[in-house]
Structures are given as C-alpha cells and as structure tokens.
A protein has these predicted regions:
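Short beta-strand-to-loop element that shapes/binds the nucleotide-sugar donor at the catalytic cleft/hinge
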Residues: 22-27
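Amphipathic beta-strand/beta-sheet edge segments enriched in Tyr/Trp
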Residues: 32-52, 166-177
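Metal-dependent catalytic neighborhoods of phosphoester/phosphodiester hydrolases
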Residues: 1-2, 29-33
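CN hydrolase (nitrilase-like) catalytic-core segments centered on the catalytic cysteine
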Residues: 2-21, 83, 89-177
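Active-site-proximal beta-strand elements of phosphoester/diester hydrolases
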Residues: 36, 49-52, 76, 82-91, ...
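Glycine-/acidic-rich phosphate or pyrophosphate-binding loops and their flanking alpha/beta elements
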Residues: 67-81
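A short, polar/charged loop-to-alpha-helix boundary motif
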Residues: 52-66
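A generic fold-level signal
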Residues: 32, 69-71, 143, 168
Length: 177
C-alpha cells in the first residue's frame, strides 16, 4: 500500500467525491501479510490504514494461516467526514478495541466485516450468532457514545479445505448510535 488495488479505490473516491473505507489483503513483505482497511479521502489520497489485530481461527475462517496481527495500534483516521475509528471484522468482538478508538477521539466506528453462518450451524445457533453480532455492535455505540457502522459481506463462499461446506454471509449491514 499503495499499489494496484489502492489506485482503483483512490480513483473511485476522487471521481465520486466520497470517503471510502475498504479492506485489502496487504502484502507487506515476503511471508508477512495483513488484513488491512484503507481509508481514502474525497480527493483520492490515502487518509490512513488499520491492520486487523484479532485474527480468528474458527471453522471456515482460517485467517491465522495467512494473516499477521496488526501493529499500527488503535488510532482514529482524520477525514473530511470526521475521525474514523476503523476496525476489521473479528476486532468487533473485543470491547477494548472500540474503547481505545473512542478514547483516542474516534467519532464513528466502522467495521468492514465478513461474518455469516457455517454450513453445519443449526437454526438456533444461527439466530444466537446473528443476535450476538448486532448486540455487540450496538453495545459499542452505546458504551462509547458514538455511531457504529457495521458493513457485512453477502453471498456464499465454499470452504475449499473440506472441513465444512462453507459460509453463507448474512449481509444485514447497519448503523447504530
């Protein structure tokens, strides 16, 4: 970063005069990779980035085999729309991350997320997981007195390892605060 992917999003931000938050697979060095969120300002410049700190190892989520935990800390990114506390996916389950961003001055927390149901989850488990996800996000908003933007992936992804059939991402992006 910067690179070919950031050039594309930079152009989109500038052409549409919008601030964009996107997640990228960052190759920092040979064997050193991060799940990184990059924030683009309206003029297309890179306002900042955040490297995911909490790396999951759950059925069909095998990130620990690919990603290294982030090393940039919990620092809000100044943009023309405010101070954005950008965290990535699994970071949402840790209240300390949201709190540290809020204490550092974040006005909005943004979570680019890819969460859904694993193929063997029962209907009861699906409801439990979905309710927990929404409750945690709302809790961050209430506890820290700011808005939370939870943006979640949609669609199905096969688990090529064969351990499960895959994940059905549930979408349901929302704003709370």
């Amino acid at each position: 970063i910067p690179g070919p992917s950031t050039e594309i999003f930079s152009k989109i931000a500038k052409e549409n005069n919008v601030v964009i938050v996107t997640s990228l697979f960052e190759k920092r060095a040979i064997g050193l990779y991060h799940n990184t969120a990059v924030v683009f300002e309206k003029d297309g410049s890179i306002a900042g980035k955040y490297r995911k700190m909490h790396i999951p190892d759950d059925p069909a989520y095998y990130e620990k085999f690919y990603f290294t935990p982030g090393d940039l800390g919990f620092n809000p990114i100044d943009t023309s729309v405010g101070k954005l506390g950008v965290l990535v996916c699994w970071d949402q389950w840790y209240p300390e991350a949201a709190r540290l961003m809020a204490l550092a001055g974040a006005e909005i927390l943004i979570y680019p997320t890819a969460i859904g149901w694993e193929s063997t989850d029962s209907e009861e488990e699906k409801l439990k997981q979905f309710t927990a996800w929404q409750t945690v996000q709302r809790g961050h908003a209430v506890a820290n007195g700011l808005y939370v933007v939870a943006v979640n992936r949609v669609g199905f992804e096969k688990d090529w390892s064969g351990v499960t059939n895959g994940i059905q991402f549930w979408g349901q992006s929302f704003i709370s605060g």
